[in-house]
């Protein structure tokens, strides 16, 4: 079982300094089931980060959004610069290459460097947590937990429900965890990936959708 120590380096590369981020207007809420935002990554002009440096790559690739981590104990993330309240966030993710011990997942309620995360590792573990004030805290669990629903060599469909104080994580359409937290009420959504002790994590996201719960 993975221990809490793996989260000691769960510090993300901030491509824009949080304190200088522009104010993002709130997106209008819709009716339950309405699609609030959708990205298929077919065009590279929709505003997601395009980065290539010694730390990694984030870019549109092959009709998806690729994140490659070149450094151990390192993470990258990207957001579309939106502001939502309650959301249901979904995406497909596939490991292209690299170690099966990795991090890949969804974010919600990102504000000024703080957010909730929902992650899996291709060796069969998952977690719900939050990044707040420079610290990573797991929610409803003390370590990443195993799940039989994680496909180790295939596409995984991830879903994160952020509704009121409730956070619920689904992997391949099966609920694996839920937690309660009151710190964040609204914010941006996004995708993230990271490496543990071995660099080279290379994943491709697609079919990113934000739905009114």
Task: Please report, for each region that a protein language model flagged, where it lies by residue.
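Short carbohydrate-recognition loop motifs
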Residues: 56-75
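Secretory/extracellular carbohydrate-interaction modules
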Residues: 69-132
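Short, aromatic/His-centered strand-loop micro-motif at the edge of beta-sheets
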Residues: 134-157
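Flexible glycan-contacting loops in extracellular carbohydrate-active proteins
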Residues: 179-206
């Amino acid at each position: 079982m993975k221990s809490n120590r793996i989260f000691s380096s769960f510090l993300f590369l901030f491509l824009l300094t949080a304190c200088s981020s522009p104010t993002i207007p709130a997106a209008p809420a819709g009716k339950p089931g309405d699609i609030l935002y959708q990205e298929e990554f077919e065009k590279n002009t929709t505003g997601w980060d395009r980065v290539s440096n010694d730390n990694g790559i984030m870019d549109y690739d092959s009709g998806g959004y690729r994140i490659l981590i070149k450094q151990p104990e390192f993470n990258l993330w990207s957001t579309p610069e939106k502001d939502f309240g309650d959301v249901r966030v979904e995406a497909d993710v596939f490991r292209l290459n690299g170690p099966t011990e990795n991090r890949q997942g969804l974010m919600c309620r990102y504000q000024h460097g703080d957010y909730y995360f929902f992650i899996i590792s291709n060796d069969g573990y998952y977690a719900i947590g939050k990044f707040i004030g420079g610290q990573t805290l797991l929610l409803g669990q003390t370590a990443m937990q195993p799940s039989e629903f994680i496909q180790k060599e295939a596409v995984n469909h991830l879903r994160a429900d952020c509704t009121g104080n409730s956070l619920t994580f689904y992997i391949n359409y099966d609920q694996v965890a839920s937690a309660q937290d009151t710190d964040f009420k609204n914010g941006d959504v996004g995708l993230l990936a990271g490496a543990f002790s071995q660099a080279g994590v290379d994943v491709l996201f697609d079919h990113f959708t934000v739905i009114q719960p």
